[in-house]
Regions:
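Conserved alpha/beta-hydrolase "acid-adjacent" motif
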Residues: 146-151, 155-162, 225-227
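Acidic beta-to-alpha connecting loop that harbors the catalytic carboxylate
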Residues: 48, 143-146, 153-154, 218-221
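Proline/glycine-enriched tight loop/beta-turn segments at coil->beta junctions
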Residues: 2-12, 132-134, 210
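Primarily recognizes the serine-hydrolase "nucleophile elbow" in alpha/beta-hydrolase
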Residues: 28, 80-82, 88-135, 146
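Acidic glycine-/aspartate-rich tracts in secreted/extracellular proteins
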Residues: 2-4, 19-21, 48-51, 144-146, ...
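Serine-hydrolase catalytic machinery in alpha/beta-hydrolase-like enzymes
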Residues: 7-91, 101-104, 108, 228
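Alpha/beta-hydrolase-fold catalytic nucleophile elbow
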Residues: 47, 93, 117-120, 138-141, ...
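C-terminal catalytic histidine-bearing segment of alpha/beta-hydrolase fold enzymes
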Residues: 127, 136-140, 161, 171-243
C-alpha cells in the first residue's frame, strides 16, 4: 500500500497465473491494488518460467521440470526478509495451473503458508504425501468449466480429481468434520453469470481454527473473473485465517 510502514506487520498474498499466462495476466484476472490500499496488505504476481508452473503430474510444466515449489518458497522467504510481513498471515491463490500450484505449495510448505484460495485448479488425483500441518482451503470452481472440469478428467492421460473429490481430500487432511450451514450465503461471484450463482459448502475442525470451503459457481466457466464484491469477500476470508 502507498502508506506502507516498515514498523507494522502486513499480510502477504502470492497470486499465481494460469498456463500460458504471466503475472500481468493474473493481475488482470484478480486485481489486488485497490484492496491492498483498503485493507493494508502486500502482494506479488510472479511469472513462471515458460509461462507455467510445475505443480502436479497433470498440470502443467511438461517440457522442463522446474522446481517451482522451491522457487516460490524462496520468493516468500525473500519477501519476508525484505518487507515487514506477518508470518502468521501468508496466503497463496491462483487460477487454473496457478490453482494447481496453490495446492502444491500447501502440500510442500504448510509450515510457511496460512491458507490457499485456488480458482479452477485442483490437486493430485492420488496425493503422494499429505501436508505436514493443516491449513485452511477455499476452493472456487465453475460447474461449466470445460478445461478443468467440475467432475474431473485428465490432461494428456494424466488424471485430476473432481472439484468435490478434491474438496473431500482436503477436508480429511484438515480434519474438518464439523459442517457449518452456509446455505444463506450465496454470492454473485461470476461477472458473466447473472444473479447470486455461487453456493458455499463449509467445514471446520473441532476448535474452529481451520476451514475447508467450496464455492460452487453454477454456470461458471474456466476463467471466471470475480466481481468486486467477491474479490473483497475472498480477501476477508483470507484474513480471517491465521496460524
Amino acid at each position: 500500500p502507498k502508506n506502507y510502514d516498515p514498523k507494522k506487520k502486513y499480510p502477504f498474498i502470492l497470486s499465481l497465473h494460469g498456463f500460458t499466462s504471466n503475472g500481468r495476466g493474473q493481475a488482470g484476472f484478480f486485481p489486488l491494488a485497490d484492496l491492498a490500499e483498503k485493507y493494508g496488505f502486500l502482494y506479488c504476481f510472479p511469472s513462471g518460467l515458460d509461462r507455467s508452473w510445475n505443480a502436479t503430474n497433470a498440470c502443467c510444466d511438461y517440457a522442463k521440470k522446474h522446481d517451482d515449489s522451491a522457487y516460490l518458497r524462496s520468493l516468500i522467504l525473500w519477501a519476508q526478509k525484505e518487507y515487514s510481513i506477518d508470518k502468521k498471515k501468508v496466503y497463496v491463490t491462483g487460477l487454473s495451473n496457478g490453482g494447481f500450484m496453490s495446492y502444491r505449495m500447501a502440500q510442500d510448505h504448510a509450515d510457511l503458508i496460512t491458507a490457499i484460495v485456488p480458482f479452477a485448479g485442483v490437486g493430485f488425483k492420488n496425493w503422494p504425501k499429505q501436508p505436514k500441518n493443516p491449513l485452511s482451503v477455499l476452493h472456487i470452481h465453475g460447474t461449466k468449466d470445460s478445461t478443468i472440469k467440475w467432475k474431473g478428467g485428465s490432461i494428456i492421460a494424466r488424471a485430476y480429481p473432481s472439484a468435490e473429490e478434491n474438496f473431500e481430500n482436503w477436508r480429511r487432511f484438515n480434519k474438518c468434520d464439523k459442517a457449518v450451514d452456509a446455505s444463506k450465503e450465496k454470492i454473485d461471484l461470476a461477472r458473466r453469470v447473472s444473479g447470486k450463482e455461487t453456493t458455499i459448502t463449509r467445514f471446520t475442525n473441532k476448535d474452529g481454527t481451520v476451514t475447508t470451503e467450496l464455492w460452487k459457481v453454477s454456470g461458471g466457466g474456466h476463467v471466471t473473473p470475480p466481481t468486486a464484491e467477491a474479490r473483497e469477500r475472498i480477501i476477508k476470508w483470507m484474513f480471517a485465517q491465521s496460524k
